[in-house]
């Protein structure tokens, strides 16, 4: 647009057009957590790679456990960091507290059943996982990076944390202990993403005009 301002009216931007009806339907299917845990469930979805900084989430879970916070953290995804993460989990004695569940064809029941979604990564674009979590009503804890900041207003749909185990733990603890904040963020997160469903209608209108 800066180079060809005369074409500005012909340009529209659409981020991650997603079939929300499909996600809504799949979230209602059988699946999700099977361990019978009744405490607070934390969820992260993504590849097990350095960029996702999951070692900090493991360390954050240790801090939460040491403070007596009742929670269990689940991660959906696979990647090259699995072995190192498992070693760290064993070293910190978190085998029953931080669970690597692997990949699944249908993550949506997990989103729906989770209490808090955590996405504390080193770098992020426009994360589909964050959008899906928010759509299904998860309050979010996100690290301060450009892609995450675009998807969350701090204190509205969730909370923003620094990229450190201490900060992640503090912000997760904040949502766990403040039920009112957690519920308000849940409603706001779903409302924000549901409003974006209009993008599909806009795209169809543009296609009809061509």
PLM segments and residue spans:
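Aromatic "clamp/platform" in nucleotide-sugar-dependent glycosyltransferases that forms part
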Residues: 103, 122
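A conserved mid-protein helix/loop that constitutes part of the nucleotide-sugar donor-binding site
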Residues: 40-63, 80-87
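Carbohydrate-associated surface elements
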Residues: 17
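Nucleotide-activated donor-binding/catalytic signature segment of Leloir-type glycosyltransferases, i.e.
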Residues: 86-102
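Conserved acidic donor-binding segment of nucleotide-sugar-dependent glycosyltransferases
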Residues: 154-165, 174-179
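A short, well-ordered alpha-helix in the C-terminal region of glycosyltransferases
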Residues: 181-195, 202
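Short hydrophobic beta-strand element within catalytic cores of glycosyltransferases
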Residues: 139-142
């Amino acid at each position: 647009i800066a180079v060809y301002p005369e074409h500005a009216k012909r340009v529209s931007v659409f981020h991650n057009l997603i079939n929300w009806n499909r996600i809504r339907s799949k979230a209602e299917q059988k699946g999700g957590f099977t361990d019978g845990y009744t405490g607070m469930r934390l969820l992260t979805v993504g590849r097990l790679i350095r960029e996702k900084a999951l070692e900090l989430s493991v360390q954050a879970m240790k801090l939460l456990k040491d403070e007596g916070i009742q929670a269990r953290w689940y991660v959906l995804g696979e990647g090259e960091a699995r072995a190192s993460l498992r070693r760290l989990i064993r070293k910190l004695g978190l085998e029953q507290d931080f669970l690597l569940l692997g990949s699944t064809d249908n993550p949506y029941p997990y989103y729906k059943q989770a209490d808090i979604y955590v996405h504390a990564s080193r770098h992020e674009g426009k994360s589909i996982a964050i959008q899906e979590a928010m759509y299904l009503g998860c309050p979010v804890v996100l690290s301060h990076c450009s892609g995450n900041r675009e998807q969350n207003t701090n204190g509205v749909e969730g909370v923003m944390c620094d990229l450190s185990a201490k900060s992640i733990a503090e912000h997760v603890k904040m949502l766990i202990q403040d039920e009112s904040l957690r519920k308000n963020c849940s409603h706001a997160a779903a409302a924000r993403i549901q409003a974006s469903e209009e993008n599909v209608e806009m795209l169809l209108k543009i296609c009809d005009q061509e």
